[in-house]
Design a protein with these regions (language model features):
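Functional cores of ribonucleases/endoribonucleases
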Residues: 74-121
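Compact soluble domain cores
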Residues: 5-17, 21-93
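Enriched for short, Lys/Arg-rich terminal
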Residues: 114-139
Length: 139
């Protein structure tokens, strides 16, 4: 018997307040004097699908390094929020915040979470050209 497993991502819409709280926490970490982009920002660069929708491809295409990604993350706004996903692989914390940002007239899909209680780290699971249209509930 052949069975196909389909992984269903269930997006939820966080409240404006929750998105603002996430962005405030993100900015606090990024703008902290103690922030070290090599230790406090984890960028997942693995390529699962098409190479042109990978973080590595975008970084090469735009000649970006980690500090460029940090600068773009510092610019994120409520209007760029798209959705919230549940992280099936890591439930600590379970929420992944998804943003869409226009960079060089291309839409970039950004998926983030903040980990840790005392020493917080930013986990950037996606920073690549958007594969699909994105919705922006607070635009």
């Amino acid at each position: 018997i052949y069975m196909e497993v389909i992984i269903i991502k269930i997006p939820i819409q966080s409240t404006k307040k929750d998105v603002k709280n996430f962005l405030n926490e993100l900015m606090t970490i990024l703008n902290s004097q103690n922030f070290n982009e090599d230790n406090d920002l984890i960028i997942i660069r693995s390529t699962k699908d098409d190479i042109q929708f990978s973080t590595r491809y975008l970084m090469l295409d735009l000649d970006y390094d980690t500090s460029d990604i940090v600068e773009r993350l510092k610019e994120l706004t409520l209007a760029e929020y798209s959705e919230t996903l549940i992280d099936k692989d890591d439930s600590n914390p379970p929420l992944l915040f998804v943003f869409g940002k226009s960079i060089d007239n291309k839409l970039v899909y950004i998926k983030l979470k903040i980990k840790g209680n005392t020493s917080k780290k930013i986990l950037c699971l996606s920073f690549h050209y958007a594969r699909h249209n994105m919705n922006f509930p607070y635009k």
